[in-house]
Design a protein with these regions (language model features):
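Acetyl-CoA-dependent GNAT
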Residues: 8-12, 16-78, 89-91, 156
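Conserved acetyl-CoA-binding loop-helix of GNAT-fold acetyltransferases
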Residues: 75, 81-94, 117-121
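Conserved GNAT acetyl-CoA-binding A-motif
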Residues: 96-108
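Conserved catalytic-core motifs of GNAT/GCN5-like acyltransferases
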Residues: 105-108, 120-144
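Short hydrophobic/aromatic beta-strand or adjacent loop that forms the aromatic wall/cage
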Residues: 41, 145-151
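A generic structural micro-feature
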Residues: 67, 143-146
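Conserved N-terminal entry element of GNAT/NAT acetyltransferase domains
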Residues: 1-9, 150, 155-157
Length: 157
């Protein structure tokens, strides 16, 4: 498997796959092309035998000088549980450290139990929200009306 920095042309390969990889959920509109053009040093693609099998889109915060943010991560369903996500995250963590940052943040939907489990397994902590649902701290309407989110933070120090 090869991990490389994302290129603008990867947008045209990845976006048609996103909804399929998410079991039909409409997710592709959450990843506009600007991420592929402006965050190439902190976004990565995983390929196996020339086939795209995963990606991570992240960036360094302009507002918080010690922080970075993971915006979107996907692994081909047939390649899950092969440590592809772990390699993508580690590449991102290394890029974050090289830029003298030590805090990584990300969010997910409360319905995405796989993502919640994965992030806690990777050492992320769930940040306090404004309510608890099924034992999970939730931030109500974080991304707009009826768009609740679970917020994560990981310290790399």
């Amino acid at each position: 498997m090869e991990i490389r920095s994302v290129k603008g042309s990867d947008y045209y390969v990845i976006t048609p796959l996103i909804n399929e990889w998410w079991g039909g959920r409409n997710m592709s509109d959450k990843l506009p092309k600007l991420f592929f053009d402006h965050f190439t040093q902190t976004s990565f693609v995983a390929e196996k035998d020339g086939k795209l099998v995963g990606f991570l889109i992240g960036f360094l915060s302009q507002t918080h000088p010690n922080e970075a943010y993971i915006h979107f991560v996907g692994v081909h369903p047939e390649y899950r549980k092969h440590n592809i996500g772990k390699h993508l995250y580690n590449n991102f963590f290394n890029a974050v450290k090289q830029n003298n940052r030590s805090v990584v943040r990300c969010v997910t939907s409360p319905v995405n139990k796989v993502s919640i489990a994965y992030h806690t397994q990777m050492g992320f902590e769930i940040e306090d929200g404004d309510r608890i649902v099924d034992g999970l701290s939730i931030n109500t309407d974080y991304d707009g009306e009826d768009q609740d989110r679970v917020l994560f933070v990981k310290n790399l120090d």
